[in-house]
Each structure stands twice: as structure tokens, then as C-alpha cells.
């Protein structure tokens, strides 16, 4: 019984260590709420906006076309 518990604890700790070392929680934690800037995409298309934001601000950024008065602007958020 004790060997089984030790094995389960060791396996759980090993899996947590692997999960943290691969930065999976950071990748999933992208909330896209913090405004980082704008990208000059005209006309604003979601794919082009996202590509521009990633190229300008880094991989952890997501780009979204958002209405600003009468125009669509490409906003980059983290």
C-alpha cells in the first residue's frame, strides 16, 4: 500500500513539474484584456490583425478588430 502511494505521489509531482516547465499554464492564461497598442491594418480583417499584432508585440498578444466611432481598428491586447 505504501509503495502504491509513493508511486502515485512521485508521478503526480513529475507531471506537475513537466507541466510547469513547458509553460502550458502561461499559454492558456492569455486573456486579451490589457491594451498594448494598434496595428495599421486597413481594412481590418481578423487574421491580418492577429498576425500584425503578433509580429509587432510578440507571441503572447492577440489582435482583434474593434469598432471605434465609425471605423474598425486593429487593437492588440495581452
Curated annotation (Swiss-Prot):
Q: Which cysteines are joined by disulfide bonds?
A: 44-65, 49-74, 53-76
What Gene Ontology cellular component terms go with this record?
extracellular region
Keyword entries, A-Z: Antimicrobial, Disulfide bond, Fungicide, Plant defense, Secreted, Signal
Chief location category: secreted
Provide the protein's localization: Secreted
| Top-rank taxon, per record | Eukaryota
Q: What is one process in the GO biological process aspect for this record?
A: killing of cells of another organism
Signal peptide limits = 1-29
Q: Which family does it belong to?
A: Belongs to the DEFL family.
Q: Identify this protein by name.
A: Putative defensin-like protein 202
| Organism field | Arabidopsis thaliana (Mouse-ear cress)
The taxonomic lineage of its organism, from the top, reads: Eukaryota, Viridiplantae, Streptophyta, Embryophyta, Tracheophyta
